[in-house]
C-alpha cells in the first residue's frame, strides 16, 4: 500500500516556506477529503478557537466547518466582548487561551505579521499554542491561496505554463501577495492589471503589468480582486473612485467574458462587488469558480488543520 505524503507543521502562517511537494501534498489531501475520504481518527480531544479581529463570513464559516468535520471542539471567541477592548495584547489573549487548554487558534488580524510574537516567544515567555493565519492585514492569506491552487489544479491538472492574470486592488490584497509568489514557484506565468496606482514595481519580479484588454484573450485564469475600500483611508484615489468607471476599464463585463478562451476560468476571493470587478449576472456563469472556491476552501482548511495537528502531535496524531 502506498504511503501517504502528509504535511506536518507546528504553525500554518504563510505559504512562502512551503515546498512545491508540500503544496502538492496539501492539494492531494484536500481532494481526498472532498472525494469522501476518511478523516483522521482522533484518540484525544483537540480544542480550537477562531479569533477573527476583522470582519469575515466565508473564511470564518469555512474554518469552523472544517474543524467540525475533523471532529475538533470549537471554543467560541468574540473579540467585541473580549478583554482586547480593555487593552489586552494579542499575546496575552493567546497566553490565556493556552492556559485554559485551547490547542490551536485560527486568527485574522489587521496587523501584518501579527503572528511573529506568537510563534517566536521571547526569552522567559512560555506560549505554546498552534497558530493558523486566517489573514494578516495586507500581508498573507495562506488558506485562500491554497484553496485557489486547489481550484486551478482541479480544473487544469497542472500549473506549469498556465497564464494567470491578477487584476484589481493588488497593493492592498493579501490574496494577491500569497498567490503571485506561489504561482510563480509552481511554474505559472503571472500577469497583472488594474489601476496603476494600486500596483507596485516590487511585483515585477513575479510577472508583467499589462492593460486588461490585452490579457483577456490569452489568459487561462482571471483572478479578480475586490476593491478594498476599508484599506483606503489614506489613499487620495479613494475619494475619486467611480464604480461604473472601474467596471468599464478593469471589470469583466459580457464583452470581455465572450473574448475569454473556452477553458478560461474566473476566480474571486470574495466578497464580490457586483458590477465592479464582475458583472453581477456573471457570478454564477460557467466560467466563474466563486462557489467552487468556497466549496474547496472547507477541504483545504481541513488539510491545513490536519497538518498542524500532526506537527503538534495533537489528537493522538503524529
Curated annotation (Swiss-Prot):
One of its GO terms (biological process) is amino acid metabolic process. Its EC number is 2.1.3.2. Carbamoyl phosphate binds at residues 58-59, 108, 141, 144, 270-271. The keyword Disulfide bond does not apply. Keywords: Pyrimidine biosynthesis, Transferase. It catalyses: carbamoyl phosphate + L-aspartate = N-carbamoyl-L-aspartate + phosphate + H(+). One of its GO terms (molecular function) is aspartate carbamoyltransferase activity. L-aspartate binds at residues 86, 174, 226. Pathway: Pyrimidine metabolism; UMP biosynthesis via de novo pathway; (S)-dihydroorotate from bicarbonate: step 2/3. GO terms for cellular component: cytosol. It is an enzyme of class 2 (transferase). Belongs to the aspartate/ornithine carbamoyltransferase superfamily. ATCase family. Catalyzes the condensation of carbamoyl phosphate and aspartate to form carbamoyl aspartate and inorganic phosphate, the committed step in the de novo pyrimidine nucleotide biosynthesis pathway. Heterododecamer (2C3:3R2) of six catalytic PyrB chains organized as two trimers (C3), and six regulatory PyrI chains organized as three dimers (R2). This is Aspartate carbamoyltransferase catalytic subunit. It comes from Lactobacillus gasseri (strain ATCC 33323 / DSM 20243 / BCRC 14619 / CIP 102991 / JCM 1131 / KCTC 3163 / NCIMB 11718 / NCTC 13722 / AM63).
Amino acid at each position: 500500500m502506498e504511503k501517504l505524503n502528509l504535511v506536518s507543521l507546528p504553525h500554518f502562517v504563510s505559504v512562502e516556506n512551503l515546498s512545491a511537494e508540500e503544496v502538492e501534498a496539501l492539494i492531494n489531501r484536500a481532494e481526498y477529503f472532498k472525494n469522501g475520504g476518511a478523516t483522521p481518527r482522533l484518540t484525544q480531544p483537540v480544542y480550537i478557537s477562531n479569533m477573527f479581529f476583522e470582519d469575515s463570513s466565508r473564511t470564518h464559516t469555512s474554518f469552523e466547518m472544517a474543524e467540525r468535520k475533523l471532529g475538533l471542539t470549537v471554543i467560541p471567541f468574540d473579540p467585541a466582548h473580549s478583554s482586547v477592548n480593555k487593552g489586552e495584547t494579542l499575546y496575552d489573549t493567546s497566553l490565556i487561551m493556552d492556559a485554559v487548554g485551547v490547542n490551536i487558534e485560527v486568527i485574522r488580524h489587521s496587523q501584518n505579521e501579527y503572528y511573529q510574537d506568537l510563534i517566536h516567544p521571547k526569552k522567559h515567555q512560555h506560549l505554546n499554542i498552534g497558530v493558523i493565519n486566517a489573514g494578516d492585514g495586507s500581508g498573507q492569506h495562506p488558506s485562500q491561496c491554497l484553496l485557489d491552487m486547489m481550484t486551478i489544479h482541479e480544473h487544469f491538472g497542472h500549473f506549469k505554463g498556465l497564464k494567470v492574470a491578477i487584476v484589481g486592488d493588488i497593493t492592498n490584497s493579501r490574496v494577491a501577495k500569497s498567490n503571485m509568489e506561489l504561482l510563480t514557484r509552481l511554474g505559472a506565468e503571472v500577469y497583472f492589471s488594474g489601476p496603476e496606482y494600486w500596483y507596485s514595481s516590487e511585483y515585477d519580479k513575479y510577472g508583467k503589468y499589462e492593460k486588461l484588454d490585452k490579457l483577456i484573450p490569452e489568459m487561462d485564469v482571471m483572478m479578480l480582486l475586490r476593491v478594498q475600500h476599508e484599506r483606503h483611508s489614506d489613499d487620495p484615489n479613494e475619494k475619486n473612485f467611480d464604480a461604473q468607471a472601474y467596471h468599464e476599464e478593469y471589470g469583466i463585463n459580457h464583452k470581455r467574458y465572450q473574448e475569454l478562451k473556452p477553458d478560461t476560468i474566473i476566480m474571486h476571493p470574495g466578497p464580490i462587488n457586483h458590477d465592479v470587478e464582475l458583472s453581477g449576472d456573471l457570478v454564477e456563469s460557467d466560467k466563474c469558480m466563486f462557489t467552487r472556491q468556497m466549496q474547496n476552501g472547507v477541504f483545504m482548511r481541513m488539510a491545513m488543520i490536519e497538518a498542524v495537528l500532526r506537527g503538534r502531535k495533537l489528537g493522538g496524531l503524529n
